[in-house]
Amino acid sequence: MLSFSDILLKLQEFWKNQGCLIVQPYDIPAGAGTFHPATLLRSLDSKPWNVAYVAPSRRPTDGRYGENPNRLGSYYQFQVLIKPSPDNIQELYLRSLEALGLDLKSHDVRFVEDNWESPTLGAWGLGWEVWLDGMEVTQFTYFQQVGGIPCRPVAVEITYGVERLAMYIQSVENIFDILWNDSSNSAPMLYADVHLQSEYEFSKYHFELADTQMIFSLFNQYTQEVKHCLQQKVPLVAYDYTMLASHFFNILDARKAISVAQRQNYILQIRELAKGCATLYKEMEEERTMRREKNKGL
Protein backbone atom coordinates (compact mmCIF):
# COMPACT_ATOMS: atom_id res chain seq x y z
CA MET A 1 0.00 0.00 0.00
CA LEU A 2 1.34 3.41 -0.96
CA SER A 3 1.86 5.90 1.84
CA PHE A 4 1.05 9.60 1.48
CA SER A 5 4.76 10.32 0.98
CA ASP A 6 5.03 7.56 -1.63
CA ILE A 7 2.17 9.08 -3.64
CA LEU A 8 3.94 12.44 -3.80
CA LEU A 9 7.25 10.83 -4.76
CA LYS A 10 5.66 8.71 -7.49
CA LEU A 11 3.86 11.69 -8.99
CA GLN A 12 7.11 13.65 -9.00
CA GLU A 13 8.95 10.78 -10.65
CA PHE A 14 6.24 10.25 -13.26
CA TRP A 15 6.07 13.87 -14.36
CA LYS A 16 9.85 14.26 -14.25
CA ASN A 17 9.99 11.42 -16.76
CA GLN A 18 7.55 13.33 -18.97
CA GLY A 19 9.97 16.25 -19.14
CA CYS A 20 8.65 18.40 -16.30
CA LEU A 21 10.98 20.46 -14.18
CA ILE A 22 10.44 19.51 -10.52
CA VAL A 23 10.48 22.66 -8.40
CA GLN A 24 9.88 23.09 -4.68
CA PRO A 25 6.83 24.40 -2.82
CA TYR A 26 6.71 28.18 -2.54
CA ASP A 27 7.43 29.74 0.85
CA ILE A 28 4.36 32.01 1.06
CA PRO A 29 0.91 30.74 2.13
CA ALA A 30 -1.51 30.27 -0.76
CA GLY A 31 -5.00 28.87 -1.22
CA ALA A 32 -4.03 26.66 -4.17
CA GLY A 33 -1.10 25.49 -6.25
CA THR A 34 -2.13 27.91 -9.00
CA PHE A 35 -0.79 30.81 -6.90
CA HIS A 36 2.80 29.51 -7.16
CA PRO A 37 4.74 31.85 -9.50
CA ALA A 38 5.85 28.76 -11.44
CA THR A 39 2.22 28.47 -12.57
CA LEU A 40 0.62 31.89 -12.27
CA LEU A 41 3.36 33.95 -13.91
CA ARG A 42 5.17 31.34 -15.99
CA SER A 43 1.91 30.39 -17.71
CA LEU A 44 2.21 33.78 -19.43
CA ASP A 45 5.64 33.02 -20.93
CA SER A 46 5.88 32.88 -24.71
CA LYS A 47 8.28 29.93 -24.58
CA PRO A 48 7.47 26.34 -23.49
CA TRP A 49 7.32 25.68 -19.75
CA ASN A 50 6.74 22.28 -18.12
CA VAL A 51 6.76 22.09 -14.33
CA ALA A 52 5.46 20.00 -11.43
CA TYR A 53 5.56 20.45 -7.67
CA VAL A 54 3.93 19.72 -4.33
CA ALA A 55 1.70 22.62 -3.29
CA PRO A 56 0.86 22.97 0.42
CA SER A 57 -2.38 24.97 0.42
CA ARG A 58 -4.18 26.99 3.10
CA ARG A 59 -7.84 27.92 3.10
CA PRO A 60 -8.66 29.34 6.55
CA THR A 61 -12.45 29.23 6.04
CA ASP A 62 -12.29 25.45 5.46
CA GLY A 63 -10.74 24.66 8.85
CA ARG A 64 -12.85 22.52 11.19
CA TYR A 65 -10.62 22.17 14.28
CA GLY A 66 -9.53 18.74 13.05
CA GLU A 67 -13.00 17.35 13.75
CA ASN A 68 -14.18 16.83 10.17
CA PRO A 69 -12.94 13.62 8.47
CA ASN A 70 -13.02 15.15 4.99
CA ARG A 71 -12.28 18.86 5.35
CA LEU A 72 -9.11 20.74 6.23
CA GLY A 73 -7.89 24.31 6.48
CA SER A 74 -4.43 23.19 5.32
CA TYR A 75 -3.82 20.41 2.84
CA TYR A 76 -1.74 19.37 -0.17
CA GLN A 77 -2.13 19.55 -3.90
CA PHE A 78 0.18 18.19 -6.55
CA GLN A 79 0.43 20.64 -9.41
CA VAL A 80 1.44 20.13 -13.03
CA LEU A 81 1.63 22.89 -15.66
CA ILE A 82 2.53 22.18 -19.28
CA LYS A 83 2.74 24.93 -21.91
CA PRO A 84 1.82 24.42 -24.66
CA SER A 85 -0.70 21.73 -23.83
CA PRO A 86 0.19 18.39 -25.47
CA ASP A 87 -2.45 16.53 -27.48
CA ASN A 88 -2.11 13.41 -25.33
CA ILE A 89 -2.45 15.09 -21.92
CA GLN A 90 -5.46 12.99 -20.87
CA GLU A 91 -3.57 9.82 -21.71
CA LEU A 92 -0.57 11.03 -19.69
CA TYR A 93 -2.81 11.80 -16.73
CA LEU A 94 -4.38 8.34 -16.81
CA ARG A 95 -0.91 6.81 -16.95
CA SER A 96 0.00 8.81 -13.83
CA LEU A 97 -2.89 7.13 -12.00
CA GLU A 98 -1.59 3.75 -13.14
CA ALA A 99 1.82 4.74 -11.77
CA LEU A 100 0.08 4.97 -8.39
CA GLY A 101 -0.99 1.35 -8.74
CA LEU A 102 -4.57 1.97 -9.86
CA ASP A 103 -6.00 -0.57 -12.32
CA LEU A 104 -8.17 1.75 -14.42
CA LYS A 105 -10.03 -1.17 -16.00
CA SER A 106 -11.45 -1.93 -12.57
CA HIS A 107 -12.55 1.65 -11.82
CA ASP A 108 -14.94 4.25 -13.20
CA VAL A 109 -12.87 7.26 -14.30
CA ARG A 110 -14.89 10.17 -15.63
CA PHE A 111 -14.01 13.59 -16.99
CA VAL A 112 -16.86 15.88 -15.93
CA GLU A 113 -17.03 19.34 -17.49
CA ASP A 114 -16.21 21.97 -14.87
CA ASN A 115 -14.77 25.27 -16.04
CA TRP A 116 -12.54 27.04 -13.52
CA GLU A 117 -12.23 30.65 -12.39
CA SER A 118 -10.15 32.48 -9.80
CA PRO A 119 -11.64 35.95 -9.19
CA THR A 120 -8.66 37.11 -7.11
CA LEU A 121 -6.17 36.16 -9.84
CA GLY A 122 -8.19 37.40 -12.80
CA ALA A 123 -7.80 33.90 -14.22
CA TRP A 124 -10.12 31.39 -15.86
CA GLY A 125 -10.00 28.29 -17.99
CA LEU A 126 -11.92 25.48 -19.60
CA GLY A 127 -11.67 21.99 -18.20
CA TRP A 128 -12.97 19.10 -16.20
CA GLU A 129 -13.13 17.54 -12.80
CA VAL A 130 -11.83 13.97 -12.81
CA TRP A 131 -13.98 11.58 -10.81
CA LEU A 132 -12.65 8.24 -9.64
CA ASP A 133 -15.55 5.95 -8.72
CA GLY A 134 -17.69 9.01 -8.03
CA MET A 135 -15.14 11.03 -6.00
CA GLU A 136 -13.39 14.09 -7.42
CA VAL A 137 -9.63 13.60 -7.29
CA THR A 138 -8.26 16.03 -9.88
CA GLN A 139 -9.02 19.30 -11.65
CA PHE A 140 -7.98 19.75 -15.30
CA THR A 141 -7.85 23.31 -16.64
CA TYR A 142 -6.83 24.76 -19.98
CA PHE A 143 -5.83 28.30 -19.02
CA GLN A 144 -7.50 30.89 -21.23
CA GLN A 145 -6.56 33.95 -19.22
CA VAL A 146 -4.29 34.75 -16.27
CA GLY A 147 -4.07 38.14 -14.58
CA GLY A 148 -6.46 39.42 -17.23
CA ILE A 149 -4.00 38.43 -20.00
CA PRO A 150 -4.82 35.79 -22.65
CA CYS A 151 -2.59 32.69 -22.46
CA ARG A 152 -0.89 32.13 -25.80
CA PRO A 153 -0.23 29.32 -26.32
CA VAL A 154 -2.75 27.73 -23.98
CA ALA A 155 -1.26 25.96 -20.95
CA VAL A 156 -2.84 22.97 -19.24
CA GLU A 157 -2.91 22.71 -15.45
CA ILE A 158 -3.48 19.45 -13.59
CA THR A 159 -4.22 19.70 -9.88
CA TYR A 160 -4.33 16.46 -7.90
CA GLY A 161 -6.14 16.35 -4.57
CA VAL A 162 -3.49 14.31 -2.77
CA GLU A 163 -5.48 13.57 0.40
CA ARG A 164 -8.43 12.31 -1.62
CA LEU A 165 -6.21 10.08 -3.72
CA ALA A 166 -4.54 8.75 -0.59
CA MET A 167 -7.88 8.01 1.10
CA TYR A 168 -8.95 6.11 -1.99
CA ILE A 169 -5.71 4.19 -2.44
CA GLN A 170 -5.50 3.30 1.27
CA SER A 171 -9.25 2.62 1.67
CA VAL A 172 -9.70 4.92 4.67
CA GLU A 173 -12.75 7.07 5.47
CA ASN A 174 -10.99 9.72 7.56
CA ILE A 175 -8.21 12.00 6.32
CA PHE A 176 -6.45 11.73 9.66
CA ASP A 177 -6.17 7.94 9.25
CA ILE A 178 -4.04 8.25 6.11
CA LEU A 179 -0.69 6.48 6.50
CA TRP A 180 1.94 9.18 6.04
CA ASN A 181 5.13 7.14 5.69
CA ASP A 182 6.52 3.79 4.63
CA SER A 183 6.66 2.04 7.99
CA SER A 184 9.01 -0.76 6.90
CA ASN A 185 12.05 1.07 8.30
CA SER A 186 10.45 3.33 10.91
CA ALA A 187 7.45 3.64 13.17
CA PRO A 188 4.20 4.22 11.25
CA MET A 189 2.98 7.81 11.26
CA LEU A 190 -0.55 8.84 10.40
CA TYR A 191 -1.75 12.11 8.90
CA ALA A 192 -3.08 12.92 12.37
CA ASP A 193 0.40 12.57 13.88
CA VAL A 194 1.69 15.18 11.45
CA HIS A 195 -1.19 17.63 11.15
CA LEU A 196 -4.02 17.18 13.66
CA GLN A 197 -2.69 19.58 16.30
CA SER A 198 -1.84 22.29 13.78
CA GLU A 199 -5.27 21.88 12.19
CA TYR A 200 -6.87 22.53 15.58
CA GLU A 201 -4.65 25.48 16.48
CA PHE A 202 -4.94 27.27 13.15
CA SER A 203 -8.72 26.78 13.13
CA LYS A 204 -8.87 28.33 16.59
CA TYR A 205 -6.68 31.22 15.46
CA HIS A 206 -8.53 31.89 12.21
CA PHE A 207 -12.02 31.71 13.72
CA GLU A 208 -11.46 33.07 17.24
CA LEU A 209 -8.10 34.68 17.94
CA ALA A 210 -6.79 36.56 14.91
CA ASP A 211 -6.26 40.25 15.70
CA THR A 212 -8.38 41.75 12.93
CA GLN A 213 -7.15 45.31 13.47
CA MET A 214 -3.56 44.17 12.96
CA ILE A 215 -4.47 42.06 9.92
CA PHE A 216 -6.40 44.89 8.27
CA SER A 217 -3.28 47.03 8.77
CA LEU A 218 -1.02 44.35 7.28
CA PHE A 219 -3.35 43.92 4.31
CA ASN A 220 -3.18 47.64 3.59
CA GLN A 221 0.61 47.70 3.99
CA TYR A 222 1.04 44.76 1.62
CA THR A 223 -1.18 46.32 -1.04
CA GLN A 224 0.85 49.52 -0.86
CA GLU A 225 4.08 47.55 -1.16
CA VAL A 226 2.75 45.79 -4.27
CA LYS A 227 2.17 49.17 -5.90
CA HIS A 228 5.62 50.38 -4.83
CA CYS A 229 7.29 47.28 -6.28
CA LEU A 230 5.39 47.61 -9.55
CA GLN A 231 6.53 51.22 -9.85
CA GLN A 232 10.10 49.99 -9.36
CA LYS A 233 9.58 47.27 -12.00
CA VAL A 234 10.15 44.21 -9.82
CA PRO A 235 7.00 42.17 -10.59
CA LEU A 236 8.21 38.98 -8.91
CA VAL A 237 8.61 40.83 -5.62
CA ALA A 238 5.28 42.59 -6.14
CA TYR A 239 3.62 39.23 -6.66
CA ASP A 240 4.99 37.92 -3.35
CA TYR A 241 3.22 40.77 -1.58
CA THR A 242 0.07 40.10 -3.60
CA MET A 243 0.10 36.53 -2.30
CA LEU A 244 0.52 37.81 1.26
CA ALA A 245 -2.36 40.27 0.83
CA SER A 246 -4.53 37.43 -0.49
CA HIS A 247 -3.67 35.21 2.47
CA PHE A 248 -4.46 37.90 5.02
CA PHE A 249 -7.74 38.62 3.24
CA ASN A 250 -8.59 34.93 3.66
CA ILE A 251 -7.90 35.18 7.40
CA LEU A 252 -10.18 38.22 7.68
CA ASP A 253 -12.82 36.32 5.74
CA ALA A 254 -12.58 33.34 8.10
CA ARG A 255 -12.75 35.68 11.09
CA LYS A 256 -15.96 37.17 9.62
CA ALA A 257 -14.40 40.62 9.83
CA ILE A 258 -15.53 41.53 6.30
CA SER A 259 -19.13 42.11 5.24
CA VAL A 260 -20.57 40.61 2.05
CA ALA A 261 -20.35 43.98 0.29
CA GLN A 262 -16.79 44.60 1.50
CA ARG A 263 -15.72 41.11 0.46
CA GLN A 264 -16.26 41.83 -3.22
CA ASN A 265 -14.29 45.06 -2.93
CA TYR A 266 -11.35 43.23 -1.35
CA ILE A 267 -11.42 40.59 -4.09
CA LEU A 268 -11.37 43.33 -6.72
CA GLN A 269 -8.40 44.97 -4.98
CA ILE A 270 -6.41 41.74 -5.03
CA ARG A 271 -7.38 41.05 -8.63
CA GLU A 272 -6.10 44.47 -9.71
CA LEU A 273 -2.82 43.81 -7.90
CA ALA A 274 -2.48 40.39 -9.58
CA LYS A 275 -3.26 41.95 -12.96
CA GLY A 276 -0.60 44.58 -12.38
CA CYS A 277 1.97 41.91 -11.56
CA ALA A 278 1.00 39.77 -14.56
CA THR A 279 1.01 42.71 -16.96
CA LEU A 280 4.44 43.96 -15.92
CA TYR A 281 5.86 40.41 -15.83
CA LYS A 282 4.59 39.78 -19.37
CA GLU A 283 5.93 43.10 -20.67
CA MET A 284 9.37 42.43 -19.21
CA GLU A 285 9.38 38.83 -20.46
CA GLU A 286 8.60 40.03 -23.98
CA GLU A 287 11.37 42.64 -23.76
CA ARG A 288 13.88 39.96 -22.69
CA THR A 289 12.76 37.73 -25.56
CA MET A 290 13.21 40.55 -28.07
CA ARG A 291 16.70 41.28 -26.74
CA ARG A 292 17.68 37.62 -27.03
CA GLU A 293 16.42 37.46 -30.59
CA LYS A 294 18.25 40.66 -31.46
CA ASN A 295 21.50 39.36 -29.95
CA LYS A 296 21.19 36.14 -31.96
CA GLY A 297 21.20 38.19 -35.13
CA LEU A 298 24.42 40.00 -34.28
UniProtKB/Swiss-Prot annotation:
Keywords: Aminoacyl-tRNA synthetase, ATP-binding, Cytoplasm, Ligase, Nucleotide-binding, Protein biosynthesis
The reaction(s) this protein catalyses: tRNA(Gly) + glycine + ATP = glycyl-tRNA(Gly) + AMP + diphosphate
GO biological processes: glycyl-tRNA aminoacylation
Gene3D superfamilies associated with the record: Bira Bifunctional Protein, Domain 2, Class II aaRS and biotin synthetases, domain 2
Gene symbol of the encoding locus: glyQ
Protein name (Swiss-Prot/TrEMBL): Glycine--tRNA ligase alpha subunit
NCBIfam families associated with the record: glyQ, PRK09348.1
InterPro entries named in the record: aa-tRNA-synth_II/BPL/LPL (IPR045864), Gly-tRNA-synth_heterodimer (IPR006194), Gly-tRNA_ligase_asu (IPR002310)
Enzyme class label: ligase
Chief place where the protein resides: cytoplasm
PROSITE patterns in the record: AA_TRNA_LIGASE_II_GLYAB
EC numbers for this chain: 6.1.1.14
Known partners and oligomeric status: Tetramer of two alpha and two beta subunits.
Entry's Gene Ontology cellular component terms: cytosol
Organism (species): Helicobacter hepaticus (strain ATCC 51449 / 3B1)
Subcellular compartments: Cytoplasm
Family that this chain belongs to: Belongs to the class-II aminoacyl-tRNA synthetase family.
One of the record's GO molecular function terms: glycine-tRNA ligase activity
